[in-house]
Design a protein with these regions (language model features):
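Interhelical loop/hinge segments that connect adjacent transmembrane helices in multipass membrane
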Residues: 2-24, 199, 203, 217-261, ...
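Helix-loop junctions and terminal segments of transmembrane helices
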Residues: 76-92, 167, 226, 283, ...
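Transmembrane helical elements of multi-pass membrane transporters/channels
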Residues: 26-43, 205-217, 221, 237-307, ...
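Membrane-interface helix-loop junctions in multi-pass transport and translocation proteins
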Residues: 50-52, 56-57, 172, 183-215, ...
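Interfacial segments at transmembrane-helix termini and the short loops linking adjacent helices
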Residues: 124-148, 342-377, 451, 455, ...
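Membrane-proximal transmembrane or re-entrant/amphipathic helices at the cytosolic face
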Residues: 1-15, 448-460, 477-543
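N-terminal membrane topogenesis motif
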Residues: 1-43, 96-104, 138-143, 217, ...
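Signature of the first transmembrane helix
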Residues: 23-88, 104, 117-121, 151, ...
Length: 543
């Protein structure tokens, strides 16, 4: 970049942003709200779709996203590179380096994603065999795959704008645009699938969502970041080395993570059938959807950790990061436990009101739902550590989760075959859940060691408070089961919702009396006042 462009870049940054503190609280709160809404739409879609296209077609739809998740691994883990280094360059006001890095990344992803789409198009016969595409869905399945793969690969290139906003800690803005996209998708699914478009309708709704979301993020980035300047002429070999070095580690780790996160569907598809893959998706839908709320913490941890590491002096850096980890793990674990405790202890009532008479294989689905709910609790305990370590550039530490997971899978999956004397959906699901729990424990021990966190402090501040929601859910488990199975689907849904609210109140009371410190108790005591103010504001606005 020449001197004139550098001067222009530096002067374009508003003075108010030169000493702007991290927006961690706003980012977390906004992300939680957006993900809560997303969770509602994701939980609401499957019963509607299942009733109209059947389990086989639904299994094919989930398999399409299994394919695109692996295609997304081809981009050198570049999103994490963007977020980490934009956060660091922003902390040091080195915007010329940020533009160079972003331009270099864009110069890689555009041709690479174009080549991947061409390969999928030309090699369709091989792809159809890989997906076990049923003959009854040969035409609409091909159209859906090409639409989803095309827009997904285009979105990977355009993620440069979203990731730049995340690196600048403007995560709240990203969440607004993401919300607009998935709400539009939800409405279109109801219209298109309800109108008989089937899998094609699902693909078309996903296309509309991505165009809306990425278009808004691109517009906002150009509008709010005057220093942003992207051009192939800014690509540099030094930036390419940064992408390959850090991104390459993330890439390999992401390959293992994607394999682990999708292994139950992949094994069910290969060893049983496409309907088994669909059943796995149903069993994991609630745990995965509700996990998006505590994941709001993790999305903010990576740029915040990078900013904290870059702005802290050598004497306080370690303590700041370890304290940050304990606080983040404490609150994200409590959030996870609130949801997972209900899903683990109220399994059948939830499935009964969710799927109704259309529930496929109730006995197997109930046991899988329980197994994935428990394993999700352990899996989410790894999130704060991996996000902070990525923010510190220590991506290799994540191998303490993925490698043990693969080792445990190599043991538990064959054991499931020996126990059931056949490859079964239930056996595969339980084996995967057990491997997740064991490997999560390995990583938690490693993170405590690397960040120099006291094991006693971790148990006292993170693990023990996380047991309280399970005690609360257990108190209500029998009344919820007994009541729900005797009522209709919609009445039962009201019971589950009311029980969930009561569960939250009991959990908060138990935490207040046993686990919260003085500052946290003071914050909790302000909740009624804040709710009252919000209701008063809403009443005034309505008048």
């Amino acid at each position: 970049m020449d001197a004139e462009q550098q001067t222009k870049t530096e002067s374009a940054q508003p003075e108010i942003e030169r000493r702007e503190p991290p927006r961690l609280r706003k980012n977390v709160v906004t992300t939680i709200g957006a993900r809560a809404l997303y969770m509602i739409t994701r939980v609401g879609i499957p019963p509607f779709v299942l009733a109209r296209i059947g389990l086989e077609a639904y299994g094919l739809w989930t398999t399409i996203f299994l394919l695109v998740s692996y295609l997304g691994l081809s981009t050198l883990g570049i999103s994490n590179v963007y977020i980490k280094y934009v956060a660091e360059y922003h902390a040091r006001r080195e915007y010329d380096k940020a533009n160079t890095l972003l331009s270099t990344g864009l110069s890689i992803t555009v041709p690479l994603c174009s080549a991947l789409y061409a390969a999928i198009w030309l090699g369709w016969g091989w792809v159809a065999k890989l997906l076990h595409l049923p003959t009854s869905h040969a035409a609409d399945g091909k159209e859906a795959v090409l639409i989803v793969v095309g827009i997904f690969l285009a979105s990977i290139s355009l993620n440069v704008f979203s990731d730049t906003l995340n690196g600048m800690q403007q995560i709240a803005a990203n969440q607004y645009f993401w919300t607009a996209g998935f709400l539009a998708e939800f409405v279109l699914i109801v219209v298109l699938v309800g109108g008989g478009r089937g899998i094609r309708g699902l693909a078309e709704a996903y296309l509309a969502r991505t165009v809306i979301e990425d278009g808004l993020k691109m517009w906002w980035a150009w509008r709010k970041l005057p220093w942003l300047h992207l051009s192939p002429r800014l690509a540099r070999r030094a930036a390419l080395k940064t992408v390959i070095h850090f991104g390459g580690l993330v890439q390999f780790q992401s390959l293992l993570t994607t394999m682990i996160n999708s292994i139950e569907r992949m094994l069910a598809l290969l060893l049983v059938n496409v309907s088994a893959a669909g059943l796995m998706d149903f069993a994991k839908k609630w745990p995965q959807s509700f996990s998006s709320i505590p994941m709001a913490f993790f999305a903010a941890f990576l740029p915040a950790a990078s900013h904290l590491e870059a702005s802290s002096d050598a004497g306080t850096k370690q303590k700041n990061l370890s304290d940050f980890y304990l606080r983040g793990a404490r609150y994200s674990n409590l959030c996870t436990a609130y949801f997972c405790s209900m899903m683990a202890l109220w399994t059948y009532p939830i499935l009964h009101v969710w799927l109704g008479a259309k529930m496929p294989m109730p006995g197997v689905l109930t046991m899988l739902f329980f197994a994935f709910s428990v394993s999700m609790q352990f899996h989410m305990l790894t999130g704060p550590g991996t996000s902070i370590l990525r923010g510190m550039g220590m991506v290799w530490e994540e191998f303490y989760y993925s490698v043990p997971n693969l080792i445990f899978l190599a043991v538990t999956v064959p054991l499931s075959y020996l126990y059931f004397e056949a490859w079964t959906t239930l056996g595969i699901g339980v084996a995967v859940a057990a491997a997740t729990i064991c490997s999560a424990c390995v990583l938690m021990v490693r993170v405590i060691f690397v960040l120099r966190v006291s094991a006693g402090a971790y148990v006292k501040q993170v693990l023990l408070p996380g047991c309280v929601p399970y005690a609360s859910a257990a108190l209500l488990a029998w009344p919820v089961w007994w009541t729900t199975v005797r009522l209709g689907r919609w009445t039962g849904a009201g019971v589950v919702l009311a029980a969930g609210a009561l569960h939250g109140a009991i959990m908060m009371a138990l935490l207040y009396g046993s686990a919260l410190n003085a500052q946290e108790k003071q914050q909790v005591s302000r909740i009624p006042t804040l709710v009252g103010r919000w209701l008063q504001s809403a009443r005034t606005a309505a008048q």
